[in-house]
Amino acid sequence: ACFPKAAVREGKTADANLAASLNHMLSAPYIDANILGYGFDMVSMLVHELQVQLPMLQNYPTEEKLSSYDRYLIGCLLIQQLLKWHLVDSTYTCPYIPVYQMKFPTILEECRKRFQFILDHGYDTPEKVRFLLEHFIQINHLEDTLEVSEA
């Protein structure tokens, strides 16, 4: 799992949010993949998430006005949703794409590359997840903020 290097009690709640977003980006689709075979209605859950998250995304300013923190969180959300919708139907276009094309085109392109990297590498073992977490910490220049731990 990914953790902030400084304790939340030291006022580093933003760091904790960054770590949680990165962890959730990979863990939520992994969990969803494992419950699909048990009759779980994934599409209903994804549609509900869409109804909650799209209005929130539409309230954000365009990407040139976003803080680096918000860019990161919005990017993690899209990658997570791309992975989840890919589980349902790999040929289906994720319904988040039109909003990202309109408001966050650069973030969208970055996320598409990262999504493909995740698919190419896989995220179905602890070793693969650790590699991905370390990779995303590095490419986002968060080495001073986040670290990967076994705990």
Language-model segments: residues:
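Post-HEXXH active-site segment of zinc metalloproteases
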Residues: A1-P29
